[in-house]
Each structure stands twice: as C-alpha cells, then as structure tokens.
C-alpha cells in the first residue's frame, strides 16, 4: 500500500465496465477526488486477453495517482501489467503459495475469511493484508455486520493490515473505520454514479478526516 495515514484509508474496487477505455477514464477521474491507498482490479467476466488489456490501461493511471494497483486473481496479468500486487480470495494455502512465488516483489493479500479460525490460518502465512468480505459483496447500504465484527476483532489483536468491504452507502466507510481497521473497500458507493465518483471520494475523505478514530503510534 502507499504511505499510511493515521486513520482508516480508502481502497477502491474498480467498477465492472466492459469497455477498457471507459473503465480507465472513470477510475482516473475518481482518483482525482482525493486520497486512495490502492485500487483492486477484478476480472469480472472478462476473458484473459481482455482482462490483460483492462489491467494495462488501469495500472499506470492508478500508480500515477499515488495508489497501489492490485490485480485480482491472475498473477500473470499482474506481472505483465507491472501491477504492485496480487489480490486473492482463496484460503491460506492459496495465499501461502502466492507469497512464496511473488513476495516481496508483489504485494500479496486477500482471503475473504468467513470466520476467526480461517482468518487466523491466513494470518499464519503472513500476507501483506487480509480482506474481510467479497469484492462484489456491497449488496446493501451498510457493510456486512459479520465483516465489521471480524475486522474489529482482527484489528484489536493482529498487526497484519486489514481491509473490510463497505456497503453501497459512502457513509458506510465511517462504520468500517470505527472498527479500527486500516482500510475500507468501496465499489458501488463510489462508482454507482460514475460522474459523481470524484466528489464522493472527496466527501468520504472529509468524513474520515473529521470522524474516523486515529491510530496510536
């Protein structure tokens, strides 16, 4: 991730847009709105060649904005697109294998652990971060209560940074921040109305600046 602030920061999940140029423009515009730690780029339903094309357009503009570009699932695409990292939704074994192959050259994290036991197993392989929720799990205005609870428990005990998936309401970012986790991931909350994405990011950062708890040194 890029340099940490002393509060929870925003992670974006790139929107599901089939046209690579349109997707790149929307993400680039959004990143003008303010601080974003990283952008995760899912494959959605794209074939490997199309995903490669999308990634090659997105990665440089994400990096130019000062954020880390993380490719979901495909290490070959991550390497060819010169991404900063790889986001995986698998179990500890999947993450361990990827860490052995790609760290520290690439950031490697993810998990989607649904319970504490699975989360601790993932923690034992020392990913760069753990993710609670699904990349397309923003189906309600608020973050899923289970993910909030897991994030709060994790952040209180374990030093590995944590990302929790937020909801479709931009204000859900604050509820995530109040658990003490380092990062909140948003997708539809930012990109539901693409033209508003920059102003939504500015509003979320202002909200977190004003109300999010501060981390102790």
Per-range role (PLM):
Residues 183:
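C-terminal binding/interaction regions
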